[in-house]
Amino acid sequence: MAPQLLLCLILTFLWSLPEAESNVFLKSKVANRFLQRTKRSNSLFEEIRPGNIERECIEEKCSKEEAREVFEDNEKTETFWNVYVDGDQCSSNPCHYRGTCKDGIGSYTCTCLPNYEGKNCEKVLYQSCRVDNGNCWHFCKRVQSETQCSCAESYRLGVDGHSCVAEGDFSCGRNIKARNKREASLPDFVQSQKATLLKKSDNPSPDIRIVNGMDCKLGECPWQAVLINEKGEVFCGGTILSPIHVLTAAHCINQTKSVSVIVGEIDISRKETRRLLSVDKIYVHTKFVPPNYYYVHQNFDRVAYDYDIAIIRMKTPIQFSENVVPACLPTADFANEVLMKQDSGIVSGFGRIQFKQPTSNTLKVITVPYVDRHTCMLSSDFRITQNMFCAGYDTLPQDACQGDSGGPHITAYRDTHFITGIISWGEGCARKGKYGVYTKVSKFIPWIKKIMSLK
């Protein structure tokens, strides 16, 4: 009997196994209800404490509504939430030209300053020539509601409507042998230098003016001309404007009986190699010489060196090369609004390297900062007219000097060099509190063009 009872128990156990298995393994939806991780609930004291962003959103993951409860301000909540969700899209400063970046979820928005547009404020709206010169490489003028670019002589406008392309190897203003590593730049301290007006001179010196300059290597000042008197001596400088025209100062012409010109030289001590070019005519103000020989420019004031400008016409054309290139003639607006608002200009010459010392045999060059008109006028006992401007250093001993008169004051813009001034006069050379005074070429553009058009 016992064996039969044991067999019945075993059969009953085996019969019940499938039912037991089905009760242990639950369906996924039912199981998930039991296996979910419950969020820690705040304690009674946490619920009554003010919202804390670190507790709510850093230690734990929070919702936007929880963040809003902390900030209690919709704008602050949006700013935080945009960064919290996917990081700060503005961290790389994507907005150009000082645009303001606002972060978003998966994006950002740039708010641009006036005259700029684009997703990153990268597009400049050149509606005015006063904004980066209308993006023009040379000259800019406003035509209706747009800007229109044009170029100096011997250049053509590029296909982009902004750039200027040289049409020849010796187009004006091209420094073919660029200064590269020897760039004549302003010393760092000059940028913060303030003008101090010191002791004034008793007399102006008309025959200025390169003190403490560096050597200008061959081809680095290709527009430089040198005026030679009947004794074969250097007495003034000049600027090549065309194959037959050299710009100089009017007061230079009254210093000698005859004038010859040298170009393309950096060392005039080697007289056997230099070539003197003959002069055909000189156009200067009538108060210097008989009117039947010179072109008349009205109102020249010899005492104040006002209208200190003259043009020499050559008998035979100057042969251009990489060492002999004319400076470009700017428009008046371009000179006043762009060139003369640059930090500095370049002055060169063979004048005296120290006050009352011999002239230099080698061509010297310096960079001189522009001086604002008010400071310029206060620094001098003599009249600074509208036809003049100042350039130079208040305390640094660098300046033009005797023998440099008539030479070029050049300003570079986008790798093109324009004539902006004529070395005219000064009170000594590189004197503390004094500046070099230059003829303002922009005032004479129509006169220069008229003279150059004469046959």
Swiss-Prot record:
* Residues excised as propeptide: 21-40, 182-209
What SUPFAM superfamilies does the record point to?
EGF/Laminin, GLA-domain, Trypsin-like serine proteases
UniProt name for this protein: Venom prothrombin activator trocarin-D
Q: Where is the EGF-like domain?
A: 86-122, 129-164
Under the heading InterPro entries, the entry gives: Coagulation_fac-like_Gla_dom, EGF-like_Ca-bd_dom, EGF-like_dom, EGF-type_Asp/Asn_hydroxyl_site, EGF_Ca-bd_CS, GLA-like_dom_SF, GLA_domain, Pept_S1A_FX
Expression by tissue: Expressed by the venom gland.
* One GO cellular component, as annotated: extracellular region
What's in the misc comment field? Is classified in the group D of snake venom prothrombin activators, since it requires the mammalian factor Va for maximal activity for the cleavage of prothrombin.
Q: Where is the Gla domain?
A: 41-86
Quaternary structure annotation from Swiss-Prot or TrEMBL: Heterodimer of a light chain and a heavy chain; disulfide-linked.
Residues with an annotated glycan are: 92, 254
**What UniProt keywords apply to this chain's record, in alphabetical order?**
Blood coagulation cascade activating toxin, Calcium, Cleavage on pair of basic residues, Disulfide bond, EGF-like domain, Gamma-carboxyglutamic acid, Glycoprotein, Hemostasis impairing toxin, Hydrolase, Protease, Prothrombin activator, Repeat, Secreted, Serine protease, Sialic acid, Signal, Toxin
Q: Where are the 4-carboxyglutamate modifications? A: 46-47, 54, 56, 59-60, 65-66, 69, 72, 75
EC code: 3.4.21.6
The molecular function terms in GO held by this entry are:
calcium ion binding; peptidase activator activity; serine-type endopeptidase activity; toxin activity
Cysteine disulfide links: 57-62, 90-101, 95-110, 112-121, 129-140, 136-149, 151-164, 172-328, 216-221, 236-252, 376-390, 401-429
Q: Which family does it belong to?
A: Belongs to the peptidase S1 family. Snake venom subfamily.
Annotated catalysed reactions: Selective cleavage of Arg-|-Thr and then Arg-|-Ile bonds in prothrombin to form thrombin
